[in-house]
């Protein structure tokens, strides 16, 4: 007996959050969990990755405010488009972190915050948190990373991206 091939939906996880909250760690963790991982993909290319004939079963895409065409409005528009794709189930994963921890992480790496414009990291972080607030409000999954180690973040990604709610604990 031959069974017809099931049309499986692509599971898409969009990962966003302020710089320093763990987006790259989350993307790498999702890759370790079997997702095709793409970090810093421009918003205008997301749909091309999701063509039914080319799509992987599980895809994780990191979205960075520093991206070439990133805008909050653009991402919110993309979410509307994705919700109409019958072959894709998507979730928006937002990584949150306290100002204190973000400042500490920046001082440890001695990197300039991308939105600081030569000013203090605090100013850049404040700008980014305000910019990302509408995205945070749309998140399906919110992970507070302030007290998480990279291993803990990977475990959280596993918990929240399991195939079914029953597997999520």
Describe the residue ranges of each PLM region.
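Conserved substrate/cofactor phosphate-moiety recognition/catalytic segment
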Residues: 16-59
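Switch/connector loops and helix/strand junctions flanking conserved nucleotide-binding motifs
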Residues: 70, 99-106, 132, 151-152
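Conserved nucleotide-sensing/catalytic segment adjacent to the nucleotide-binding pocket
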Residues: 49-80
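Short glycine-/polar-rich loops that comprise or flank the Walker A/P-loop
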Residues: 56-57, 86-91, 137-140
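Phosphate-binding beta-loop-alpha motif at adenosine-nucleotide cofactor sites
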Residues: 139-149
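Single conserved hydrophobic/aromatic residue that forms the stacking wall/gate
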Residues: 160-169
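Extreme N-terminal, non-catalytic leader segments
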Residues: 2-8, 50
């Amino acid at each position: 007996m031959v069974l017809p091939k099931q049309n499986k939906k692509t599971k898409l996880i969009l990962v966003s959050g302020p710089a320093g909250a763990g987006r790259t760690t989350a993307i790498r963790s999702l890759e370790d969990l079997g997702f095709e991982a793409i970090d810093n993909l421009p918003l205008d290319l997301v749909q091309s990755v999701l063509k039914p004939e080319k799509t992987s079963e599980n895809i994780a895409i990191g979205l960075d405010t520093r991206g070439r065409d990133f805008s909050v409005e653009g991402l919110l528009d993309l979410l509307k488009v994705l919700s109409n794709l019958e072959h894709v189930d998507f979730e928006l994963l937002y990584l949150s972190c306290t100002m204190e921890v973000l400042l500490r992480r920046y001082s440890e790496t001695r990197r300039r915050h991308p939105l600081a414009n030569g000013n203090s990291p605090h100013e850049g972080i404040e700008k980014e948190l305000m910019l990302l607030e509408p995205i945070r409000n749309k998140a399906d999954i919110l992970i507070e990373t302030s007290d998480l180690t990279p291993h803990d973040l990977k475990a959280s990604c596993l918990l929240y991206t399991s195939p079914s709610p029953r597997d999520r604990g």
